[in-house]
Design a protein with these regions (language model features):
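Glycine-rich anion-binding surface patch
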Residues: 1-146
Length: 146
């Protein structure tokens, strides 16, 4: 049985493919908008144009951290689960996410939902926009050191 909450959503899977995620690390994929498991030998299988790798949330989070220098920090407070995006190499805050807990008008309140939302937010951002924002943060840190 596939535990859907452990895997990225179809929307995230599409964006991961667009951003260059290596599908060979994933054992699940979306085909015809349905989450499926690979049956044949993984090394011989290549995703078709309309298929998307569906890695676990952790795999997607790790990929963002290692390839884009973006860490998704999920935490809980009285309002529910939240996320922040930080630079993976030094913890500098890049963006704050919104609370997705029931105290803020949502019906669900899970760590996995918020982690998926953070991954989606990070992937939706324009690469140029990220670079500009990170450069401003780095310049600010350098000024503060002087």
């Amino acid at each position: 049985m596939i535990m859907n909450e452990d895997y990225v959503s179809l929307e995230v899977a599409r964006l991961l493919k667009e951003k260059g995620f290596d599908s060979h690390y994933s054992t699940h994929f979306y085909k015809n908008n349905k989450l499926e498991c690979y049956i044949e030998d993984r090394k011989k299988y290549w995703l078709q144009k309309d298929e998307y790798a569906a890695p676990t949330l952790y795999m997607a989070q790790k990929w963002l951290r290692e390839t884009k220098n973006i860490h998704i920090d999920v935490y809980r407070n009285a309002g529910g689960w939240l996320y922040n995006l930080t630079k993976a190499d030094n913890g500098t805050l890049i963006a704050e996410g919104k609370s997705l807990g029931p105290n803020n008008g949502r019906s669900s309140d899970t760590y996995e939902e918020v982690l998926c939302a953070g991954i989606l937010y990070a992937l939706r951002r324009n690469n140029h926009e990220w670079r500009c924002q990170i450069e401003r943060i780095d310049q600010s840190v350098q000024r503060n050191r002087l």
